């Protein structure tokens, strides 16, 4: 069994339809990323992340968040960078485990007729993500494989975002039923599973995947993405469009 943990970086919204431009302060990109592992690796990954937390004097209950400030963690800036690097190195141990979907929001809202709001953008990102993980499982086991895939994501914690969760669940189920013009998604479980990221080491690692990819596109900073590269999905020595899809 494969388990995919997903998280995002940047906001899916922030576009002014009337002015046909991004709202001031909105991110240029929205990134949805996933970290896929085999079920047998679950406990080992949790142990590795806990060891890194302990090394940096953090409680194992402390959530590893990409956007945490070093002050809030009681670290110096250098310690904080080393800590983030070590978290990324955990992910890098798992080859072809990471997929990132990078949405140029202004371009998507202007040029894609089926993307009209943040729900559409998120749903389209999810579809592209599922497609690439399905391709990866097919590459490993052949087109007729029946190995199940379960997808977990961070739960939202307020009423407004719970509405987004419901829309995302609908999008997931629709994607599972329809697939894409290239392939179906029969191996994915019937429902997307929501989990509190504070209690999931793997969702925390997915957050680092999304953060590192977002940092590269939004700020042109590849420092942490370069650490992750061994884990990013590759096919025929190609990452672009395969492990990282810019849309």
Regions found by a protein language model. Name each.
Residues 1-247:
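Phosphate-ester processing/binding pockets and catalytic centers
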């Amino acid at each position: 069994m494969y388990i995919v943990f997903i998280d995002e970086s940047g906001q899916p919204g922030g576009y002014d339809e009337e002015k046909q431009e991004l709202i001031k302060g909105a991110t240029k990109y929205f990134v949805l990323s996933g970290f896929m592992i085999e079920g047998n690796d679950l406990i080992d990954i949790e142990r590795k992340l806990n060891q890194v937390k302990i090394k940096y004097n953090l409680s194992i209950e402390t959530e590893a968040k990409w956007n945490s400030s070093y002050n809030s963690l009681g670290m110096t800036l250098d310690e904080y960078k080393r800590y983030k690097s070590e978290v990324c190195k955990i992910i890098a141990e798992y080859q072809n485990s990471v997929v990132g979907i990078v949405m140029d929001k202004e371009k998507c809202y202007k040029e894609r007729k089926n993307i009209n709001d943040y729900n559409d953008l998120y749903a389209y990102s999810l579809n592209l993500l599922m497609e690439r993980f399905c391709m990866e499982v097919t590459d490993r086991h052949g087109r007729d494989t029946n190995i199940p895939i379960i997808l977990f994501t961070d739960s939202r914690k307020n009423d407004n975002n719970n509405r987004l969760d419901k829309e995302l669940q609908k999008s997931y189920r629709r994607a599972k039923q329809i697939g894409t013009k290239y392939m179906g998604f029969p191996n994915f479980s019937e429902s997307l599973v929501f989990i509190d990221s504070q209690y999931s080491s793997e969702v925390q690692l997915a957050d680092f995947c999304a953060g590192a990819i977002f940092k590269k596109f939004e700020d042109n900073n590849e420092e942490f993405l370069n650490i992750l590269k061994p884990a990013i999905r590759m096919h025929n020595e190609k990452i672009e469009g395969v492990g990282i899809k810019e849309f």
